[in-house]
Amino acid sequence: MLSSNPGPIGVFDSGYGGLTILHGIRQLLPEYDYLYLGDNARAPYGPRSFDVVYEFTRQAVVKLFEMGCHLVILGCNTASAKALRTIQQNDLPQIDPNRRVLGIIRPTAEVIGDLTTSRHVGVLATEGTIKSESYDLEIHKLHPDIEVSGVACPFWAPLVEYNEADSPGADYFVKKRIDEIMRKDPEIDTIILGCTHYPLLMPKILKYLPTGVRVVPQGEYVAESLKNYLERHPQIEQKCAKNASVHYLTTENPQKFKEQAQIFLHEPVEVDNITLG
């Protein structure tokens, strides 16, 4: 039986990248409690099939519900692309129709129309997110006139995970993908970082992008979207506890998570190990 008492807002990611989303949310909405779950033991999700990503994401969402969350944010583009819709349509009605799961692709798609002048947008993301065409679909639904080009960046997330963001290898792989997307569509004036790890590569990304091309990290837009959502849905907002606390869970070694999390958050964290599946 799931608790009906107010609980934390859950944030889920396959690894550490969702910490950039959590950071953005906490900057704007510091008063709420948060519970972050990283399925680091099974990361990365990017190359995995739709079915596997859905099953892993469903397990995480159920666990967060069991731990008191009434609202869960999928702070992972791959999970948002491959699992969100099925969970919303098929699982929530059976688990608890009053609970909510939100993704991070839609909030980015909503604001992109105000950010691009040329109406040509690039998406840099994992292979799974690019193959799903989720950004193309969401952007075209809202802004049919915008041309979207995507490029998969398979080595970018591991560069961040293994603390290699400042290495010469990072320069090589970042330049390679930036050159590729600008060749694909030279009229691009706005780039969406469609993986939550990528903001940590921002100095390298800006180094190789042509002058005047804007980069859109997701954290601030997801936070603004969540704020608006809670204002529009008071019945959900009332179920979100407000003690300004944050706790972290990982499916891997907690000590490793602590060390990596500090790269993303620049602050020490308390973390517990958890098993999914």
Where does each model-flagged region fall?
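Non-catalytic structural scaffold of enzyme domains
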Residues: 1-277
